[in-house]
Amino acid sequence: TDWNLRGLSQGRTDIPLNSTGLAQAERAGQVFSRLFRNGEKPFDRIIASPLSRALVTAEHTRDAIRSSGGPDLPLIIDPELKEVCFGVQEGQPMGEWYDPWIEEGYTPEGAESFATLQARAVGAVNQTLKEDGTPLFVAHGALFRSLRAGMGLPVNVRLPNAIPLYLTPSETGWSILPYVPETV
């Protein structure tokens, strides 16, 4: 988004994808469509935040899978996957407040606390995982950080936008691996 480009915190403000964001969404869709080659079905539904920057990415993914001969997957909007509300910090530069918000319990005025975000995010994912099948989640950066906290992984890790990741439980915890598409 233009706010990403300017280093501004977006939170719940529904900033549309700019041309870079749309290209990233299209690329993510193409990467995911490759997973459905040879009749494979690595996930059976797409669960997305209602905020347009995530929803448009989810729509590009669904459409790319269908266009490449894959299934027409259901796209489910889950309001619990919305990005955190940053309160008075929305639209402001990412600054010295962000790390204390994650690590020290500081909450900007009018914002959702990191602990509340974590409870909401973990609850939403766990509710979805009670259903049969394998979902693909399309959401937001701070929400993903809160999931990392819930999985006992390092939290304040910045990843590129629209990058596909595998999250896998194991006997010793969780692993997160980027999906690296094979070159064609």
Where are these regions (language model features)?
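Short beta-strand scaffold positions
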Residues: 48-49, 119, 138-139
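Short, active-site-adjacent cap segments at secondary-structure transitions
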Residues: 53-55, 84, 143-145
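Domain-level recognition of soluble alpha/beta enzyme cores
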Residues: 153-179
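Active-site-proximal alpha-helix that buttresses catalytic centers in soluble enzyme cores
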Residues: 1-69, 100
